[in-house]
């Protein structure tokens, strides 16, 4: 996990946030130098210090707070600096030393420290024990394997060291836990999880003997790292930090867990969302209304409508906002009919809707392509509930028309509005016109938007593209990301159209060709107009096989458990041919596939999609 894991400076780990990297690096350097390399052979200090008390005895005598602990460690590290350099230089100048000479020079002066240290940091070697060159080399090898992220060999090396009586130190265990958490995707996840549990148990054993002041200081650092990961959207690393804090007997509070839940929704981390929900449920026996709303929003943004419905049904208290969230969740994830049914249930329970709830219904009708029902609800809004339509309601109605592609009707509705359409109305129509390929109408709307509010149009909008937020441009760094796959061995992978450099390239495309044969048998006809190159028909069909979402689909089928659902996230709108192909392939392999493009979620199962082919 941390930067200083061996006798010599190493490259900084990507796990550390920029804000704390230098400070923690310096702290760990001081800690490793002062605690893990105590020189019991130093004539000036040996008479003052009982090896059975360890360095922590000095901390208790000289300090009273976590800040003073850090200062004490720093002071001790300075006193040991010259001796450390002398020993390292001696090692380099004497490569042919015998084991006995190594034992003589390095007795008590390397990573081996007193097993009775109350802070539990370091190895379990007593000051009277000696270390041979073989163990020393194995420790150096372990550090190198961690730097190279070679999980398999690092675990094997740790087992060999334990057989020789060396107990891994606290910092190295943290690093190894990180590698087990983020391990190589081609290494068996079951092995990594088993190793992670084992390593966390070792950390917990060390923490049980950790001195209180040092434990508080180290815990504070880990909490700062957790907050930094949440701030920068690093969900997996934040979850890893929670595991480390749990092994240190620290329970993350509910407010921090809810913050992570919001980040999961923004990052669309499906498995992580369920993990965070489990940790939240374990931390408190009863969630209040606002906490449940966070969970509903998280599952809604991740495309997990069933999980959101489960949270909704378990809620003992609901208000108007609760119903708005669940109706919007069903609508945006392709369950428009369920959204309408939920609205009917809302009215049957004697509740009175507001404009926001009706806007959710308009959106659901638009996703269903049922404009007529949406207009009936619009009439009911003012007739039955006395709600005067606002400009936000008219924006939602324009969206309802345009979502299924009724662009001419949407323009006619705008021209018949009883109030002057504002920039939001024209911007909504502009975006959806370009999504559906009506560039002429999109350009016309763009001219109106520029006249009303020029700040609404960025460079992409003026050039005829769908407007994107500045934050999205920064996040993507203007780099095209194609199919992103969630759910394969609890990992996320990225694919690009036509990528032939994958480790399993032959198997992937062979599977796609076999699936195509079965698809043709059930009536599939390739939409070759989606292949824009000037090539023959057969070449176009071959080109379509290399679309990123199909590669992601094949990768999931080959590398995940049978019948297990998975998710494909597309950075652009899913093309018609891939949409049809994914529906049929999901039926052939018996999988549920959740596909997310720039417009909506598609949940494909048994050859059908929740979007009803409206997207």
Curated annotation (Swiss-Prot):
Residues 521-615 are annotated as: Type DYW motif. This is Pentatricopeptide repeat-containing protein At2g25580. Residues 490-520 are annotated as: Type E(+) motif. One of its GO terms (biological process) is RNA modification. One of its GO terms (molecular function) is RNA binding. The keyword Transport does not apply. It comes from the Eukaryota. PPR repeats lie at residues 288-318, 319-353, 354-389, 390-420. Keywords: Repeat. Residues 58-98 have a biased composition (Polar residues). Belongs to the PPR family. PCMP-H subfamily. It holds the Pfam family DYW_deaminase. InterPro entries: DYW_dom, Pentatricopeptide_rpt, PPR_At4g14850-like_plant, TPR-like_helical_dom_sf. The gene is PCMP-H75. It comes from Arabidopsis thaliana (Mouse-ear cress). Residues 40-98 are annotated as: Disordered.
